[in-house]
């Protein structure tokens, strides 16, 4: 029986692996708690070190291996920390990706890139637009002014909670909190997620700042009990911020 993920989780495990086997193992753990996942794709050029599948083939992606690794019918989010996003996007959409993240500040001509993605997967193609959500990731040092030209083109934003992207287990950068608050006050309609440095200690403040999705890496994967830690994060969403009951 194939498991179908819902794209509505608040607590989202971030998967950053160097092998196909690791990816399959972490997807299985995430599936057991019924959650969405974010798969981090790092080409080793825009950001390093490289993640799978770039660790096996830096240039040519093996679509069949990607399809083998991801359960049929599963949908997920991809964080594209790569120099040439369009060259890898098709393979991962075939595998089930429905949310796509581009990194503002790391890519030149991001406006042209967004236009091309909309053209390829928009209303003029045999693809349902509502199934593909496009977001922009904002580094700690990136000015929010750089986001403004693309507000009408994106479905959500992701604030990076760490200073060095592409590596899990780094300390949370507290200076991101006022940036989140400022963006939330200016664009209350745009969902915000945070990736990097999300722990049981930093999560309450992020939720209270208006964050609607927490992308969590080492705090889940390096915990003694993945499922219990996931539940603890879930309980926090009911105690803090917009999800408090």
State where each predicted segment sits.
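Catalytic cores of alpha/beta
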Residues: 23-29, 84-94, 141-153, 198-214
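Glycine/small-residue-rich loop that forms an oxyanion/phosphate-binding "nest" at active or ligand-binding sites
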Residues: 50-113
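Conserved, mostly hydrophobic/aromatic
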Residues: 30, 39-40, 92, 157, ...
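Glycine-rich phosphate-binding active-site loops on the catalytic face of alpha/beta enzymes
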Residues: 100-109, 158-169, 209-230
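Glycine/Thr-rich beta-alpha phosphate-binding loop at enzyme active sites
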Residues: 44-57, 140, 146-181, 185-187, ...
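Alpha-helix-loop-beta-strand connector modules within alpha/beta enzyme cores
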Residues: 53-78, 116-140, 175-193, 233-245
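Hydrophobic, well-structured mid-protein blocks that either form specific transmembrane helices
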Residues: 87-145
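Hydrophobic faces of well-ordered beta-strands that scaffold small-molecule active sites
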Residues: 9-15, 37-39, 74-80, 100-102, ...
């Amino acid at each position: 029986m194939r498991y179908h993920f819902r794209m509505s989780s608040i607590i989202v495990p971030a998967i950053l692996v160097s092998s196909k086997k690791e990816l399959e193992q972490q997807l299985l753990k995430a599936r057991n708690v019924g959650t969405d996942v974010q798969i981090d794709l790092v080409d080793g050029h825009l950001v390093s070190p490289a993640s799978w599948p770039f660790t096996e083939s830096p240039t040519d992606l093996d679509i069949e291996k990607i399809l083998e690794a991801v359960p049929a019918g599963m949908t997920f989010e991809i964080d594209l920390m790569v120099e040439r996003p369009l060259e890898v996007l098709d393979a991962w959409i075939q595998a089930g990706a429905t949310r796509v993240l581009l990194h503002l500040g790391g890519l030149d001509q991001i406006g042209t890139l967004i236009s091309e993605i909309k053209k390829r997967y928009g209303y003029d193609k045999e693809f349902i637009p509502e199934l593909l959500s496009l977001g922009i990731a904002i580094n700690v040092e990136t000015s929010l002014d750089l986001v403004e030209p693309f507000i009408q083109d994106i479905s959500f934003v992701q604030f990076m909670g760490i200073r060095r992207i592409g590596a899990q287990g780094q300390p949370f950068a507290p200076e991101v909190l006022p940036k989140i608050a400022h963006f939330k006050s200016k664009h209350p309609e745009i969902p915000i997620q945070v990736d990097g440095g999300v722990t049981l200690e930093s999560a309450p403040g992020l939720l209270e700042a208006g964050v609607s999705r927490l992308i969590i890496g080492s705090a889940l994967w390096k915990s003694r009990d993945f499922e219990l830690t996931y539940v603890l994060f879930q309980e926090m969403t009911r105690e803090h911020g917009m999800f408090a009951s």
